[in-house]
From Swiss-Prot:
Pfam families: TACO1_YebC_N (PF20772), Transcrip_reg (PF01709). Belongs to the TACO1 family. GO terms for molecular function: DNA binding. GO terms for cellular component: cytosol. It comes from the Bacteria. This is Probable transcriptional regulatory protein HY04AAS1_0501. One of its GO terms (biological process) is regulation of DNA-templated transcription. InterPro entries: Integrase-like_N (IPR017856), TACO1_YebC-like_2nd/3rd_dom (IPR048300), TACO1_YebC_N (IPR049083), Transcrip_reg_TACO1-like (IPR002876), Transcrip_reg_TACO1-like_dom3 (IPR026564), YebC-like (IPR029072). It is found in: Cytoplasm.
Amino acid sequence: MAGHSHWAQIKHKKAKVDAQKGKLFGKLIREITVATKLGGPDPNANPRLRIAIEAARKVSMPMDTIEKAIKRGTGNDKEGALEEIVYEGYGPGGTAIMVVVATDNRNKATSEVRHAFSKHGGNLGSSGCVSYLFEQKGVIEIPKEATDEEKLMEAALEAGADDVESTEDMFIVYTNPKDVYTIKDILASKGFTIESAKTSLIPTTTVEIKDVDTAKKLLNLLEHLDELDEVQEVISNFEIDKDILAALG
């Protein structure tokens, strides 16, 4: 699961910049809308929506903004309906990339994603071209600060988690997708601080990037994709040695 971890570490380092740009608000609004569309407007009956609302409140999103996003998800809104699309493609170094988009304009989204791939030495592929290299997992992120790894490991496995992984500043708890929100609630009830909880695509195998130039091209592509307005998540199956990451600054 190193591909997820490396990009997650890089993403956490730029998270504050995203928040300043207002991009985080946009992502959360779209997540609330899509979650409502797929699972209904009642957060008590729709765990994905409940988690999205919790994340929005955590960054002080106004309640009327949240309610408007829910309304759009039910279709009782004048704005166009959002749909969730997953694009698949190839990146530098033979890497596989999945891009999750929430959009009301499929043609525009496809054009923007294709342009990003082409600009940075990648190729947008057809549906199914790389998805077999990933599996759906529940992903719970817990800040390392003030978290006892042994206690977390014990509590997570007891709650039914598959594995716990350590990154630079986070513990990542992996679960069966259908259990992620239940396990998140169990861990929260035991006093663990939850940074985020969601379902995500996780690589089953990784591709090692062995040179600085390829690593730079790949990370530029992933960052370009992630900065597109309608992109919700970018997942890749790369693994980069820490010395190469250090050389990139």
